[in-house]
Amino acid sequence: MMRHEVERRLRRAPKSVARDEAFAKAIRSIPKGKVATYGQVAAAAGYPLYHRHVAALLRRTHVGLPWQRVIGSGGEIKLKGVAGMEQRTRLEMEGVHFRGKRVDITEHQHKFKTWEFD
């Protein structure tokens, strides 16, 4: 790796660490029986339009986070195969109801209180 690329990555690192911490805080605030979309988590953390970064964070490290409570827009479970089945099972165990393959958003959508994040 070239020196200038290393320096560039180091300059970015504090920003991405702070962003990931904000996402994690938002995810932890989602109570049992409620869900939020990737976009809602990103917006609540102060980074609207960063929904893909929320997904990337959950792919990298979901230990200690209630990852199952983060879903796709429209209530879809975005994970495929066994992981998707596990997410659905975990949500059902928390009392989340589905309409077909989608979470009943009207009943289970979490309303973030961002003023509680500070």
PLM ranges: what are they?
Residues 2-118:
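Nucleic acid-binding interface residues in structured DNA/RNA-binding domains
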